[in-house]
């Protein structure tokens, strides 16, 4: 398998809901006029708490500082796994890289963020951790770093100043999980048809002002949650929204898999997770991989979100609760 270190240098930001008005214009520019901003990595996720942005340096320039904008200190690099094997159908999403990427990085105390899209899964690691990442994964992968759009082979020797942090850290924190009742769909869209849904997209993201129902509370089973994720990365669009929101969009323009599968969410974290703790993604992806359950995974500024097949949500909750009980004991 190949691991590609993409050229994007990404910043992770949070826009507070009361301050969204200040960022509507630059966000619309990034959404609909990417050539003007030269932004090639743009992701916007609405949650009950805030709007999380993952943007490259060109996109970051478009966002003015304000009291409503929080910026994570680190610059993040983007990793992507490609497999050329003609393997039989297997679990998709973060599950397929849980053992080969997520678990080893957690063992070596590398904090990761995940962004699953319709097309692929992006793994974000802090720039300062790159040497550790390469040393950790070089045995498993052929590693390439994109330079000027071309893949250049990378070896351990190229990053000889970093070595795996093999010391045992503290036991992973057991984070509570919630499963809201929404049913979600994962969709894509031909970028040429984006203008046709622009009005609806702007309304849903900026002007609907939906009130989250218990979503930010400590209730173990919130009835529903405000969640909408849009990404435009290297010309490819991915959208995650609940089935009710999808009804607002023209059905002939949004594309999904032939099965039209719906997904349920597992939300990770009772308090904001922060960026320093390692193993949060592994805590979820590992048990799902062991059970061969497909999952999309989207990290945000405060919490993490896994999407699993709707018909398997009961077994997923059972698997994760068993894992939590094991960690807590």
Swiss-Prot record:
PTM (free text): Phosphorylation at Ser-14 by AKT1, promoting the interaction between CASTOR1 and RNF167.
The entry's keywords: Cytoplasm, Phosphoprotein, Ubl conjugation
GO molecular function: arginine binding; protein sequestering activity
Positions bound to L-arginine: 111-112, 274, 280-281, 300-304
Any single GO CC term annotated in Swiss-Prot or TrEMBL for this entry: cytosol
InterPro entries: ACT-like_dom_sf, CASTOR1_ACT-like, CASTOR1_N, CASTOR_ACT_dom, CASTOR_fam, CASTOR_mTORC1
Compartmental location: Cytoplasm, Cytosol
GO biological process: cellular response to L-arginine; negative regulation of TORC1 signaling
ACT domain location: 72-138, 260-321
Primary localization: cytoplasm
Post-translational modification Phosphoserine, affected residues: 14
Written domain comment of the UniProt record: Based on x-ray crystallography data, the protein would be constituted of 4 tandem ACT domains instead of the 2 predicted from the sequence.
Protein family membership: Belongs to the GATS family.
Assembly behavior: Forms homodimers and heterodimers with CASTOR2. Interacts with the GATOR2 complex which is composed of MIOS, SEC13, SEH1L, WDR24 and WDR59; the interaction is negatively regulated by arginine. Interacts with TM4SF5; the interaction is positively regulated by leucine and is negatively regulated by arginine.
Stated role: Functions as an intracellular arginine sensor within the amino acid-sensing branch of the TORC1 signaling pathway. As a homodimer or a heterodimer with CASTOR2, binds and inhibits the GATOR subcomplex GATOR2 and thereby mTORC1. Binding of arginine to CASTOR1 allosterically disrupts the interaction of CASTOR1-containing dimers with GATOR2 which can in turn activate mTORC1 and the TORC1 signaling pathway.
Cited PANTHER family: CHROMOSOME 1, WHOLE GENOME SHOTGUN SEQUENCE, CYTOSOLIC ARGININE SENSOR FOR MTORC1 SUBUNIT 1
Protein name as catalogued: Cytosolic arginine sensor for mTORC1 subunit 1
Protein source organism: Pongo abelii
């Amino acid at each position: 398998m190949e691991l590609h270190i993409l050229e994007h240098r990404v910043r992770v930001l949070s826009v507070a809901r009361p301050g969204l008005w200040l960022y509507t214009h630059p966000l619309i520019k990034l959404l609909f006029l990417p050539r003007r901003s030269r932004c090639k990595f743009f992701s916007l996720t609405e949650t009950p708490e805030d709007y999380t942005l993952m943007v490259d340096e060109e996109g970051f320039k478009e966002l003015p500082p304000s009291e409503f904008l929080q910026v994570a200190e680190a610059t993040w690099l983007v990793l992507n796994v490609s497999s050329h094997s003609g393997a039989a159908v297997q679990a998709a999403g973060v599950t397929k890289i849980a053992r080969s990427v997520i678990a080893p990085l957690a063992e070596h105390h590398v904090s990761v963020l995940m962004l699953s899209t319709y097309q692929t899964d992006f793994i974000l690691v802090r720039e300062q951790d790159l040497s550790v990442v390469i040393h950790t994964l070089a045995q498993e992968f052929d590693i390439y770093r994109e330079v000027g759009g071309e893949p250049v082979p990378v070896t351990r020797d190229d990053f000889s100043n970093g070595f795996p942090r093999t010391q045992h850290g503290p036991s992973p924190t057991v984070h509570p999980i919630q499963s809201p009742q929404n049913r979600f769909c994962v969709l894509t869209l031909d970028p040429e048809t984006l203008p046709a849904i622009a009005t609806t997209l702007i309304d849903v993201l900026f002007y609907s002002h939906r009130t989250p129902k218990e979503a930010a509370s400590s209730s173990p089973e919130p009835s529903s949650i405000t969640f909408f994720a849009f990404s435009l990365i290297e010309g490819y669009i991915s959208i995650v929204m609940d089935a009710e929101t999808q009804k607002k969009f023209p059905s002939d323009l949004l594309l999904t898999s032939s099965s039209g599968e719906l997904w349920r969410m597992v939300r990770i974290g009772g308090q904001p997770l922060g960026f320093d703790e390692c193993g949060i993604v592994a805590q979820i992806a590992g048990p799902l991989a062991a059970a061969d359950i497909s999952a999309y995974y989207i990290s945000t500024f405060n919490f993490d979100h896994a999407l699993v097949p709707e018909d398997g949500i009961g077994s997923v909750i059972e698997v994760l609760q068993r894992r939590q009980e094991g960690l807590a004991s």
